[in-house]
């Protein structure tokens, strides 16, 4: 079964408004297709979408983070996976992780002669916004 065929079911479920079904299907597929980066990445994206929609951690953030990391581990050359993980880390207010991953993403773009993109522009703005709302008195230097 090709990757496109494997992911067709969850994509159709999402199109039909069944995000929960798509996530459940991808969760099962992660166990069956442990070495398929696209399955792990799509699960992380859909699960994050679910949490954003619910404005709550319906799906544990740690599980989402592990799915992103697994996708990156399986396909180290995929810049999209790095950018998506960095964005997720920033959404979770894990600023040091986000900064590290955005730096790695920028380096990959540079090595591939790809100009700096909108992802990095938005990241810099969102990092500044996140720092502005943090209680910096809690940070010990």
Language-model segments: which ranges?
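Structural signature of tandem alpha-helical TPR/SEL1-like repeats
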Residues: 17-24, 52-67, 92-104, 134-136
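Canonical positions in the second alpha-helix
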Residues: 29, 70-71, 105
């Amino acid at each position: 079964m090709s990757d496109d065929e494997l992911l067709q079911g969850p994509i159709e479920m999402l199109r039909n408004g069944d995000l929960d079904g798509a996530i459940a299907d991808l969760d099962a597929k992660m166990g069956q297709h442990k070495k398929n980066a696209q399955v792990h990445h799509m699960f992380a994206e859909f699960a994050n979408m679910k949490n954003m929609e619910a404005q709550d951690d319906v799906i544990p953030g740690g599980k989402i983070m592990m799915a992103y990391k697994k996708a990156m581990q399986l396909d180290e050359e995929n810049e999209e996976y790095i950018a998506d993980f960095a964005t997720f880390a920033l959404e979770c207010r894990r600023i040091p992780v986000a900064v590290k991953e955005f730096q790695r993403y920028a380096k990959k773009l540079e090595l591939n002669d790809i100009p700096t993109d909108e992802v990095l522009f938005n990241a810099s703005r969102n990092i500044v916004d996140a720092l502005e709302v943090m209680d910096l008195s809690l940070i010990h230097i």
